[in-house]
Regions:
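Motif I (Walker A/P-loop) of helicase-class P-loop NTPases
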Residues: 1-6
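Loop/turn-to-beta-strand initiation segments
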Residues: 15, 74-77, 100-103, 125-129, ...
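SF2 helicase catalytic motif II
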Residues: 82-84, 92-137
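Conserved RecA-like P-loop NTPase helicase motor core
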Residues: 112, 275-393
Length: 409
């Protein structure tokens, strides 16, 4: 809403391009614009049935013909997915339009640092606004720099602590649940760590030789992803989830899973316990997704299991708790997951966040100790961010201290 107010400070002849990562976010923006400016014209670019070229062409004709643009009475918004907005056809469509008539809003702007989306930065807009709860891309300083070059530095920041104090987000308690890697899982994690160290050393040597910063290679990123996946899918998480399931008596809980395989493991547990649940996956039809959200909203089901697609932006029905099974060291992922449960229509509500924290096995050989320490540090970095805004932070800090002492970490 704030970005729409900002966009309306420009003349009505200024066309507003709004870029978003997913189609559901296009739908949300469309709903907000219709409520905010009922007389506006909205062109959708990026959905299956989109005919944006036919719709946008006549809109841009007066700009190309040097017509009297002061006569324009209604604003035009172009809602598009990042994939469409970075397409050369879309970028070229704006080439002969003076930049003073174009403003661009990027929702979840961190996505635009990806190499295949950076073509968006060739749209010459005079006014630019980037939105993100987590604007920095992890392990991608090159992509971060590209975003800053186009949008400039941060102009306004509003953190979660302040939002909770101001009553825009609900208070919450944080509950870490510890899952231990088995020997085989940690050995694989250690092997990838050693391989990654070698590749990063080569990368730094190359940067030093060329005298400039370079984006990480695809191979290094793949190693990072493979190593992260071992933590996300640690087998002990399923048992921890089962124990949690048997001890909890809450309703309307979000469960964040890594992939379909992990989701199926959790579903088998829910079937045993008799708890009611629905799924929300990217490969579902929109009608199925909407049905799942509606059932969850009405309280017809106790749990909503999701794979990543609820991480960003999408408005999720009010819920009392979330379980992060697919725990991650990506600041963007866990901050956005926390945000899903803190949005509230009831200011008196206190949300509960259950986070499965992965720790190394006790039985490791001396040469693996550095990798074990680094792993627990990365997990604790996430835990610290979660704890710092929690109502029960004193109790949690004591619990974590005792757990780490027990594992001699």
């Amino acid at each position: 809403i704030t970005s729409l107010f900002a966009s309306n400070t420009a003349p009505k002849s200024t066309i507003t391009i709004i870029c978003v990562p997913t189609v559901p976010l296009i739908q949300q923006w469309e709903e907000e614009i219709k409520k905010f400016d009922k007389l506006s014209s909205i062109i959708i670019a990026g959905t299956e049935k989109s005919n944006w070229k036919e719709l946008l062409g006549p809109k841009l004709a007066p700009y190309r013909l040097n017509s009297d643009l002061t006569k324009i009475q209604n604003r035009t918004y172009v809602l598009c997915t990042n994939k469409t907005a970075s397409n050369t056809d879309f970028v070229n469509f704006w080439n002969d339009i003076p930049s003073k008539y174009i403003q661009l809003i990027a929702d979840e702007v961190h996505h635009l640092g990806a190499p295949d989306l950076q073509n968006i930065f060739n749209i010459n807009s005079s006014r630019r606004l980037a939105l993100s709860a987590t604007p920095e891309r992890q392990w991608d300083s090159y992509g971060n720099q590209k975003i800053l070059e186009y949008f400039g530095k941060t102009v306004f920041e509003y953190d979660i602590k302040q939002a909770i104090r101001d009553g825009f987000l609900t208070h919450y308690t944080y509950h870490p649940l510890f899952a231990e890697m088995n020997i085989d899982e940690f050995q694989e994690y250690y092997n990838l760590t050693q391989e990654m160290k070698q590749e990063i050393a080569k990368h730094k040597q190359k940067e030093k030789k060329l005298g400039k910063e370079l984006p990480l290679s695809y191979f290094v990123k793949r190693l990072l992803e493979q190593r992260a996946l071992i933590k996300k899918k640690t087998s002990d998480k399923v048992k921890i989830f089962e124990d949690w399931c048997n001890s909890i008596n809450q309703k309307q809980i979000l469960v964040f899973c890594e992939d379909t395989e992990q989701m199926e493991d959790l579903i088998s547990i829910l079937n045993k316990t008799g708890k009611r649940y629905v799924n929300y996956k990217s490969d579902m039809k929109n009608s199925q997704k909407n049905q799942s959200l509606e059932m969850f909203k009405k309280g017809e089901t106790e749990l909503l299991l999701a794979i990543r697609c609820l991480d960003e932006g999408l408005d999720v029905p009010d819920c009392s708790a979330c379980v992060i099974v697919s725990s991650s060291t990506s600041i963007r992922e866990f901050v956005q997951r926390r945000g899903r449960v803190l949005r509230t229509t009831n200011r008196d509500k206190i949300a509960n966040i259950y986070d499965i924290v992965v720790i190394p096995p006790k039985e490791i050989i001396p040469e693996q100790e550095d990798a074990a320490d680094a792993m627990i540090k990365s997990e604790m970095d996430r835990v610290k961010i979660m704890v710092d805004c929690a109502d029960n932070q004193t109790d949690v800090k004591q619990e974590i201290g005792e757990k780490l002492q027990y594992y001699e970490l």
